[in-house]
Amino acid sequence: GKLTDSQEDYIRHVWDDVNRKLITAKALERVNLVAEALSSNYH
C-alpha cells in the first residue's frame, strides 16, 4: 500500500521529532559525562 502525502508528512514529522530527541539525549549524556569528569578532578 502506498502512503498518502499527509501520511508521509506525518511520518516525516514524527521521525524528525524522534531524531531531535535522540540527538538531545546524546548531547546531554555527553555534557553529564564531561561535568562528572571535571567535578571528580576538583574533589
UniProtKB/Swiss-Prot annotation:
GO cellular component entries: extracellular region
Keyword match Secreted: yes
Tissue-specific expression: Expressed in mucus-secreting tissues.
Location in or out of the cell: Secreted
Main location: secreted
Keywords noted in UniProt: Antibiotic, Antimicrobial, Fungicide, Immunity, Innate immunity, Secreted
Domain of life (superkingdom): Eukaryota
One biological process term in Gene Ontology: defense response to fungus
Main function: Shows antimicrobial activity against M.luteus (MIC=4 uM) and E.coli (MIC=12 uM), as well as against the yeast C.tropicalis (MIC=4 uM). Shows a pro-inflammatory effect, since the topical application of the protein induces an increase of cellular recruitment characterized by an increase in the number of leukocyte rolling. Does not show hemolytic activity on human erythrocytes (at doses up to 100 uM).
Description of how the protein assembles with itself and partners: Possible monomer.
Family designation: Belongs to the globin family.
Protein name: Antimicrobial protein PcfHb
Protein species of origin: Potamotrygon cf. henlei (Freshwater stingray)
Upper classification of the organism: Eukaryota, Metazoa, Chordata, Craniata, Vertebrata
